[in-house]
């Protein structure tokens, strides 16, 4: 397709006409763009328009293509079960043919979620932790088709090239053991898979999440370890007990009263170091030069392997 299919977008959004209002941002590695459209009834919508480069069929390209199938599956079957405690945009329409994907979503800005940040602090970070806790509690123990068997964009099975690029032999050898600890956890849930600050949109009193290309199974602490990695006020140990306490307080509130929250917290809190090491493993192979300057990450690896 040479251009954005505005008639189809208008149709699935319940409007007569749609007009491209402007680009919000490009997708990773030039794989498309996020576009805002104006509808003739006064509403707006956000369109994720993914168009992988022609002929891109390497491991990285195939992973991204799979992610463009996963996200519509999330919005079709999982998003309707998310309420205000783990708010996500509503799906208006989706289609994909293996070479191009269109995802038409509610415009969260129009719903009041206009705030963005590269590093949430204070009440904003607490809201993100509460969102994650609610999401993790909601899907605890469920097997959900259509998403990744193992959630997160850095999980080992899809990052073999990065594994081979790791200079640290101990971290490289430890990688499958770390992955096995996470996939073998007793308490599995649905994780966001890319729970960085930039994927949360804030209203004055709440928060919503976007970008579910890498959602899949895993212990919820994987999302938390990723979210808390490398923050400006991170403790020297790399283990932010105060914020972990906040997350587990929110998780206990979200879980059914009959659930053994103590056992869940023991396992997931005990896996925090493992989840953080697993992300360090990815960083070390993905961007070796950047990892070489990550003194805190390297110190954490030395202290925990």
Model-derived features: positions:
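Conserved NTP-binding catalytic cores of kinases and kinase-like/nucleotidyltransferase enzymes
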Residues: 1-98, 203-207
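Regulatory N- and C-terminal appendages and interdomain linkers associated
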Residues: 1-28, 263-266, 270-273, 277-305
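Active-site acidic catalytic loop and adjacent metal/ATP-binding pocket
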Residues: 28-39, 46, 178-222
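Short alpha-helix boundary/capping segments
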Residues: 63-67, 119-127, 216-219, 235
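Active-site activation/catalytic loop segments of kinase-like enzymes and analogous catalytic loops
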Residues: 73, 220-256, 274-295
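Short, glycine/acidic-rich hinge or "gate" loops at secondary-structure transitions
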Residues: 95, 142-153, 257-264
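Conserved short submotifs of the Hanks-type protein kinase catalytic core
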Residues: 100-111
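ATP-dependent phospho-/nucleotidyl transfer catalytic cores
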Residues: 111-192, 203
């Amino acid at each position: 397709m040479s251009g954005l299919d505005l008639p189809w977008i208008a149709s699935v959004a319940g409007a007569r006409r749609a007009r491209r209002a402007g680009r919000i941002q490009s997708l990773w590695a030039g794989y498309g763009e996020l576009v805002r459209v104006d509808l003739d009834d006064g509403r707006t919508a956000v369109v994720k328009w993914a168009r992988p480069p022609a002929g891109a069929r390497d491991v990285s390209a195939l992973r991204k293509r799979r992610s463009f199938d996963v996200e519509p599956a999330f919005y079709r079957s999982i998003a309707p079960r998310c309420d205000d405690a783990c708010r996500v945009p509503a799906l208006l329409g989706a289609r994909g043919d293996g070479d191009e994907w269109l995802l038409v979503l509610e415009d969260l800005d129009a719903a009041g979620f206009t705030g963005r940040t590269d590093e949430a602090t204070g009440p904003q970070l607490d809201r993100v932790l509460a969102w994650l806790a609610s999401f993790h509690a909601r899907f605890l123990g469920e097997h959900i088709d259509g998403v990744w068997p193992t959630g997160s964009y850095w999980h080992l099975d899809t990052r073999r090239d990065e594994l081979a690029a790791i200079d640290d032999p101990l971290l490289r050898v430890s990688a499958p053991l770390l992955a096995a600890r996470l996939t073998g956890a007793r308490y599995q849930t649905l994780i966001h898979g890319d729970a960085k600050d930039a994927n949360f949109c804030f209203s004055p009193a709440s928060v919503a999440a976007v970008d579910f290309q890498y959602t899949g199974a895993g212990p919820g602490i994987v999302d938390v370890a990723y979210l808390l990695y490398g923050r400006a006020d991170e403790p020297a140990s790399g283990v932010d007990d105060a914020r972990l306490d906040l997350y587990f307080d929110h998780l206990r509130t979200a879980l059914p009263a009959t659930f053994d929250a103590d056992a869940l917290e023991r396992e997931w809190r005990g896996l925090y170091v493992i989840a953080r090491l697993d992300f360090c493993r990815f960083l070390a192979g993905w961007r070796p030069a950047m990892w070489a300057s990550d003194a805190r990450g390297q110190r954490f690896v030395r202290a925990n392997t």
